[in-house]
Amino acid sequence: MSTHRKARGMRTQLLVAQYLAANGWPHAESTGSGRSGVDVLGTPGLAFEVKARTDLNPLAWVKQAEQNAGLPVAVFRPNGMGEHPETFIAFLRLGDLTALLRAAGYGTEPEEQG
């Protein structure tokens, strides 16, 4: 990996951690490079995997996040996105998304299958 790509990845991880810290997870912090596990610490119940790449492989990223405890979320910063983490793209499984949306008051409880 080139020095520029590695620096962009670390910068993206830091931006995501700072965004989370300012938006409800005050203890969020970037793990730094070379550490195994989640990319952002201080987000109990969540497992963030942060990617700043040109290739697109969300299934692998979500599976990587699933290796850690918590709700797996892969955050992707495509090229040309700038340094605005609120515009980055987040991937999570549809079942997890619908559960979160229902908990937030959207939709209705699923019908029981008999």
Can you describe what each PLM-predicted range is?
Residues 1-114:
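Catalytic phosphate/metal-binding cores of nucleic-acid and nucleotide-processing enzymes, i.e., regions
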